[in-house]
Structures are given as structure tokens and as C-alpha cells.
Amino acid sequence: MSRGFGREKRLLTPRQFKAVFDSPSGKVPGRNVLLLARENDLQHPRLGLVIGKKSVKLSVERNRIKRQIRETFRHHQLELAGWDIVIIARKGLADLDNPELAKQFAKLWKRLSRNPAKTAAEPGAANNTHA
């Protein structure tokens, strides 16, 4: 598999985004960001970014954040094969510098690839298994 970030590695249409939003099989919350993931039938992952003006005001910052996310995704895509992933930015994401962003997303990718079944559970659900 190529480590590039071509068209086939992106979520492009509203229908593709809607499929992930409507029925995510994994959720990974992070600091100032939320990852929604859904399994796909492909041999590679696909990425979609939702970074609005409300959460990141300046276009320069939005573009910087998108570049950093795409770059970390490119390096971790072998671990993420078979996922459609949507990243939703929240306020405060622009306050992180590039190394902090890269570090945060490396952890988020690892959490998603390592334990997809648990990420789909609600935050308190894992603790209630012995009830």
C-alpha cells in the first residue's frame, strides 16, 4: 500500500461523510478533537476533516491543522486500513503547535487501531461489564 494521500484515501462526498456521522463504529475523543470512525470494505483507510470557522477562526490556522492531520494520517495509514475516519475540530485546537498536534494525533491513531471495539462503546460502558 502506498503511503501517499491520493483521492482514494479521502472522504469526498456528503454521502460518505453522512455514513460515518450516522453510524460510527468507533469514537475516539481527544483534546479539542473528536474522531469518528466506521469500518469500510476497502483495503485502505479514508479520511475526512471537519474544521469549521467556529472552532478555528483563522484560515491560516485551519489550513495548518489540516496539513498536520493529513501528514500524521499518511504515516499511520497502514495501521488504520479498513476505516473511514472523520475528524471534528473543537475550540482550542489552534492553540496547539505542530509538534503537539503530531503527538496528539499519533496517540489517537494508535488508540483507534489498537482497540476498535472498545472505542465504539460509551465511555462508562467498559466499567459496567461486571454489574
UniProtKB/Swiss-Prot annotation:
GO annotations of cellular component type: ribonuclease P complex
- Which GO biological process categories is it annotated with? tRNA 5'-leader removal
What EC numbers are recorded for this enzyme?
3.1.26.5
Q: Which UniProt keywords apply?
A: Endonuclease, Hydrolase, Nuclease, RNA-binding, tRNA processing
* Pfam families membership: Ribonuclease_P
Annotated signal sequence is: none
The record's GO molecular-function terms, alphabetically, read: 3'-tRNA processing endoribonuclease activity; ribonuclease P activity; tRNA binding
Q: Which domain of life is it from?
A: Bacteria
Catalysed reaction(s)?
Endonucleolytic cleavage of RNA, removing 5'-extranucleotides from tRNA precursor
| Assembly notes | Consists of a catalytic RNA component (M1 or rnpB) and a protein subunit.
Q: Which family does it belong to?
A: Belongs to the RnpA family.
Q: What does this protein do?
A: RNaseP catalyzes the removal of the 5'-leader sequence from pre-tRNA to produce the mature 5'-terminus. It can also cleave other RNA substrates such as 4.5S RNA. The protein component plays an auxiliary but essential role in vivo by binding to the 5'-leader sequence and broadening the substrate specificity of the ribozyme.
Q: What is this protein called?
A: Ribonuclease P protein component
